């Protein structure tokens, strides 16, 4: 033992190591640990930024198997592990994500001891490596690979010098297709280095080739792996950090916050993405037909320009804005739980201005409701977050995850401890990267990349919210801000250097055979120069070439949510003035200050410029504000004046101060000819009739384009909450209320959208009838009091107006925006869900309509629109049916108009989605129970109406559009022959949010606290009662989709019918054609003579079969007269504008 106590210049003997290998903790506590450390410090260069004292303090607290590996020794081990992972890993879900239950310290330590039995980085021979690796599981193998990666020389796999030299040489040679295989080896230090780099990208491509199974795309995992590919040594570092011990200026001190970590990692992620595309291009042949890459990798090549000119970190549609709580202190917390306790004590909710968003205030206040305790916070965490906190807080005997040990700088300025709440933009793979940096096998240097931050997930009534907590050195933060101010004041304000546009065009590269050929692997190593000293004379010149494409202002953590930028840009697409700007060539467009690259086929609807953000956080910008007639008015254009200007209030988005100068300069650069052209276009826009404007946003926007990444999609928003809801993972506080802000305002929002002809919209609706979804309120649910554009009816008045005017909207192709409201076409597939903002506690006025809340809209002749609004029933029942004339009690006619099963037959909806949602409110008068049960018992009544009864009696004075719709063969469908026992497909929402309260399209859990009640007759099972009307009669033709359903509510100035023509209400089996109540081809409308029934009976007689009654001749004559009169008014241009 005395010999062992001496410093050994060589590794210990095999016998000594064998006795120590099985007890690493014991060896650490004895005098062997200093010997090992002295040996390593003697032979291995100290890692950057570490003093000797820092090494000793860390060795006292951290277990380390081996500090640093040489490339020559571990090249073979990395290659063997990579080959095994390529074979077994692609089918494993989330293989590269740390903190998995399958990963344990014991397994990792056992594998490391087997591969490196001497403990000095010298592996066993190749045969033993193959045998050891083949017996290990993939989780431990990848953990072992990460352990070796972060302990390579300079703690990096590739290195900034190699990348910058590759970038310079590739540009010099005009970006050859095989640039990675031909140029990259010349930029690496040795063949061993080339072997490791090749295996690195080979593993990334192999894992991401099966991303549909393992949920890891090439773009995300390549950027995540940047923390191992590049160390902190970023050229031209703007801000010098302070050393924590001596307060001397050092360039490589640990990062002080998660923002500093993003500043370091995002440029590295962009470099990794560049190299990944170069690696893929090297295996793509010229012949497209011979491409054998998976579709995911093909799309990666075809949808990204090469080389990437700008950062792609914030170009994803899944960017999420979350609260960032920062504790600035001079004493760091020992564990994350202690940080939460300190935040709990310091957060002051009386100061509302301290929170940038109302959602942040509500979320944090609900978290820290009880002071001086973290039990409530722990209960609100998700299961994964609790597991992560437990792993980081538990003391492990070997490898310890979590924050690296660190001390604060002495607070010589006596700065007071404080807390602040900001906002942070992240993506899902940002969290993956943060997790990877804190994993068990990482070094202290990697654990310091994102400072002392913790990203936690909380659950609130089914919602899942992310919050970032971190603590910063208050002295370091103060000094860095002072240095930044000095730097910015000393330097003249210069914009970032942009790479000059290249002449080459991005080819759509054909795709390749598998890049895992040993021939290519050997050739890649052979390309490395024989001398280890690679030419580095171009490195100083490269320093000017490399630039961080994420600007400093873009990373000041005050950015708005990128999703809001994208949404505002899409709104500007249909704005006529935005189109005028594009035609005139002016640079004053508020959506972007830079021209979108023409050779970039992706991100057509997205601009990465940060200028969309609003500087006034307290002012809520609404997407509907530009459509509000009170706020948006065209200015008076004086063309004769010399200083002609157009000032449009509330149109330009607000910008930061530094961007306002650019806006002014761009406006000054507009030429006189462009202004004249703009003047002419504005006049032309004012002269043109509204029906000339054929604008559709169905193709520009889908529901997925407005939501966040799948696990944490925000809810639909209200007008008042637009800015914060779209820019945050935290949802509006109004989710549980019964207000209709979003719905009411969306009527204004969609008022100007669709004034196209019905036939043109039919083509778009057929094309766009896919499984995607878009937020659109269930407008039928709105109370009449919340609709400014529509008068409030009582129940009787609504019947008059509806029966008289509901059929006239086909004639009104061009009405004012205040009269015609057309939401976007619904594109929900069966089972798609809507937000609880739309699902209120009141029922639909149209009971079983084909609304996006319940069923998909089949391809039809028109795009869907809103239906007239009616007040709720005063008798205590919610209005569940469409308003129908008196005596219109014949279910046979209703069924003849709307054969639900025929719809399902045509559109092939899967049967497993035809589930009826269980209803909660069984509100049926007791006297009707027996009638409902009898109706169940006899699903096929005896009252059969002849189908072709009224063919010869078609009135000749029926308007042409009705005759065409009746006789149009496109609307004829085969006779329904389905069995009655088949459930109708349109009741397919299990709980309106997915399958059995799961799979919500907006939130991960799919659980909402405000599930809307449904009504079903007592004694009838949920899947049973709609079947009474499925096959009562066999219709010969299918009616067209009602005009008012697609063209919006009828104008309210049309005179109501006479009182004797007002029919009573009767529930209608409503599908896509229920509002019109048109009859199948050849069936004449029969009038009825039964007196009107009270409103209570209307709701009570729910799907009860009745016999046909009489003929409704007077009503038909009067309606035709009213139609003709209104048609004449419209033709003469007198339609209320």
Curated annotation (Swiss-Prot):
A GO BP annotation: establishment of cell polarity
Pfam families the UniProt entry points to: Msb1-Mug8_dom (PF08101)
CDD domains: RhoGAP_fMSB1
Its job: May play a role in polarity establishment and bud formation. The MSB1 gene may be functionally redundant.
Cellular component, GO annotation: cellular bud neck; cellular bud tip; cytoplasm; mitochondrion; plasma membrane
Keywords: Phosphoprotein
PANTHER family on file: MORPHOGENESIS-RELATED PROTEIN MSB1
Gene this chain is encoded by: MSB1
Annotated Basic and acidic residues bias: 593-608, 750-769
Organism of derivation: Saccharomyces cerevisiae (strain ATCC 204508 / S288c) (Baker's yeast)
Protein name listed in UniProt: Morphogenesis-related protein MSB1
């Amino acid at each position: 033992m005395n010999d062992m106590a001496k410093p050994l210049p060589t590794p210990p003997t095999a016998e000594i190591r064998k006795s120590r290998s099985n007890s690493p903790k014991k060896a650490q506590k004895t005098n062997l640990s200093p010997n090992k450390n002295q040996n390593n410090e003697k032979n291995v260069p100290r890692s950057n930024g570490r003093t000797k004292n820092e090494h000793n303090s860390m060795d006292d607290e951290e277990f380390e198997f081996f500090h640093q590996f040489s490339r020559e020794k571990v090249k073979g081990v990395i290659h063997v592990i990579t080959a095994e992972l390529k074979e077994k890993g692609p089918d494993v879900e989330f293989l590269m994500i740390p903190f998995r239950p399958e990963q344990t310290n014991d397994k990792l330590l056992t594998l490391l001891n087997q591969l490196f039995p001497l403990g000095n980085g010298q592996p066993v021979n190749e045969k033993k490596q193959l045998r050891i690796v083949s017996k290990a599981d993939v989780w431990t193998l990848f953990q072992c690979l990460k352990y070796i990666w972060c302990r390579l020389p300079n703690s990096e796999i590739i290195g900034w010098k190699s990348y910058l030299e590759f970038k310079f040489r590739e540009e010099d040679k005009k970006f050859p297709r095989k640039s990675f295989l031909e140029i990259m080896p010349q930029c690496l230090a040795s063949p061993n280095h080339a072997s490791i780099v090749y295996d690195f990208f080979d593993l990334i491509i192999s894992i991401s080739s099966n991303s549909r199974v393992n949920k890891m795309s090439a773009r995300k995992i390549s950027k995540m792996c940047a923390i191992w590919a590049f160390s902190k040594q970023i050229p031209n570092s703007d801000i010098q950090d302070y050393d924590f011990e001596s307060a001397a200026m050092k360039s490589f001190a640990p990062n002080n916050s998660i923002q500093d970590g993003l500043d370091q990692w995002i440029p590295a992620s962009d470099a990794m993405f560049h190299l990944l595309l170069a690696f893929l291009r090297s295996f793509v042949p010229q012949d497209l037909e011979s491409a054998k890459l998976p579709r995911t990798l093909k799309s990666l090549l075809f949808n990204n320009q090469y080389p990437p000119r700008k950062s792609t970190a914030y170009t994803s549609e899944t960017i999420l804005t979350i609260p960032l709580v920062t504790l600035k202190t001079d004493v760091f917390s020992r564990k994350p739980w202690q940080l939460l306790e300190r935040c709990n004590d310091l957060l002051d909710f009386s100061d509302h201005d301290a929170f940038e968003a109302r959602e942040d205030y509500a979320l944090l206040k609900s978290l820290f409701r009880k002071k001086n305790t973290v039990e409530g916070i722990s209960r609100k965490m998700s299961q994964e977050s609790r597991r992560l906190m437990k792993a980081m807080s538990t003391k492990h005997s070997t490898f310890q995850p979590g924050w690296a040990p660190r001390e604060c700088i002495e607070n010589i300025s006596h700065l007071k401890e404080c807390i602040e709440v900001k906002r942070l933009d992240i993506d899902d793979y940002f969290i993956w990267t943060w997790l990877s940096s804190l994993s068990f096998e990482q070094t202290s240097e990697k654990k310091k990349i994102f400072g002392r931050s913790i990203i936690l997930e909380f659950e609130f009534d089914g919602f899942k919210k992310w919050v970032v907590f971190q603590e910063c050195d208050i002295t370091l933060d103060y000094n860095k801000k002072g240095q930044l101010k000095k730097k910015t004041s000393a330097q003249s304000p210069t914009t970032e250097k942009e790479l000059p546009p290249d002449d080459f065009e991005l080819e759509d590269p054909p795709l390749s055979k598998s890049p895992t050929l040993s021939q290519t692997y050997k050739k890649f190593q052979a390309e490395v120069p024989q001398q280890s000293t690679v030419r580095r004379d171009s490195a100083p010149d490269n320093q000017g070439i490399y630039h961080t494409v994420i600007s400093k202002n873009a990373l000041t953590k005050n950015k708005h949510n990128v999703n809001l930028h994208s949404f505002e840009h899409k709104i500007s697409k249909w704005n006529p003035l935005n189109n005028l700007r594009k035609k005139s060539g002016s640079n004053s467009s508020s959506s972007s200050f830079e021209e979108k690259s023409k050779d970039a086929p992706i991100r057509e609807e997205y601009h990465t410029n940060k200028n969309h953000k609003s500087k006034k956080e307290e002012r809520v910008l609404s997407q509907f504000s530009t459509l509000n007639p009170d706020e948006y008015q065209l200015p008076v254009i004086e063309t004769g004046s010399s200083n002609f200007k157009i000032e449009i209030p509330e149109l330009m988005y607000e910008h930061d101060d530094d961007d306002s100068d650019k806006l002014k300069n761009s406006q000054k650069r507009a030429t006189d000819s462009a202004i004249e052209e703009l003047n002419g276009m504005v006049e032309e826009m004012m002269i043109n009739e509204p029906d000339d404007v054929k604008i559709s946003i169905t193709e520009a926007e889908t529901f997925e384009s407005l939501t966040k990444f799948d696990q944490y999609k925000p809810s639909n928003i209200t007008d008042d909450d637009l800015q914060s809801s779209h820019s945050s993972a935290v949802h509006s506080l109004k989710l549980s209320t019964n207000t209709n802000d979003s719905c009411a305002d969306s009527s204004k929002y969609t008022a100007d959208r669709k004034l196209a002809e019905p036939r043109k919209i039919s083509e778009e609706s057929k094309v766009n009838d896919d499984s995607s979804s878009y937020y659109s309120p269930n407008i039928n649910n709105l109370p009449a009091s919340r609709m400014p554009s529509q008068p409030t009816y009582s129940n009787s008045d609504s019947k008059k107006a509806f029966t008289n005017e509901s059929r006239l909207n086909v004639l009104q192709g061009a009405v004012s925006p205040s009269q015609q409201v057309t939401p976007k076409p619904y594109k929900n597939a069966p089972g798609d869900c809507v937000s609880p903002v739309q699902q209120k506690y009141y029922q639909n006025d149209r009971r079983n309509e084909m609304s996006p809340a319940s069923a998909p809209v089949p391809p039809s002749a028109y795009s869907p629109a809103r239906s007239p609004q009616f007040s709720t029933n005063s008798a205590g029942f919610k209005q569940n049916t469409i308003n129908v004339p008196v005596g219109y009690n014949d279910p046979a006619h209703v069924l003849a108009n709307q054969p639900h099963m025929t719809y399902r037959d045509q559109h092939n909806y899967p049967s497993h989605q035809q589930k009826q949602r269980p209803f909660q409110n069984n509100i049926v008068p007791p006297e009707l129970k027996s009638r409902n049960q009898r109706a169940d018992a006899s699903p096929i009544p005896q009252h059969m109406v002849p189908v072709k009864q009224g063919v010869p009696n078609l009135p000749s004075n029926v308007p042409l559009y009705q005759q065409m719709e009746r006789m149009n063969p496109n609307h004829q469908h085969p006779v329904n022959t389905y069995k009655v026992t088949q459930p109708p497909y349109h009741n397919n929402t299990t709980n309106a949010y997915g399958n059995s309260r799961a799979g919500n399209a907006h939130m991960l859990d799919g659980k909402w606290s405000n599930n809307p009640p449904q009504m079903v007759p007592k004694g009838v099972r949920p899947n049973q009662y709609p079947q009474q009307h499925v096959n009562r009669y066999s219709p010969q033709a299918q009616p067209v989709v009602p005009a008012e359903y697609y063209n919006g509510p009828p104008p309210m100035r049309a005179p109501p019918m006479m009182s004797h023509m007002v029919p009573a209400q009767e529930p209608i089996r409503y599908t896509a054609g229920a509002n019109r109540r048109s009859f199948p081809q050849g069936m004449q409308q029969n009038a009825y003579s039964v007196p009107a029934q009270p409103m209570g009976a209307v709701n009570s007689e729910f799907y009860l079969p009745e016999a046909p009654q009489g003929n409704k001749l007077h009503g038909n004559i009067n309606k035709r007269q009213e139609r003709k009169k209104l048609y004449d008014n419209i033709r003469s241009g007198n339609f209320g504008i």
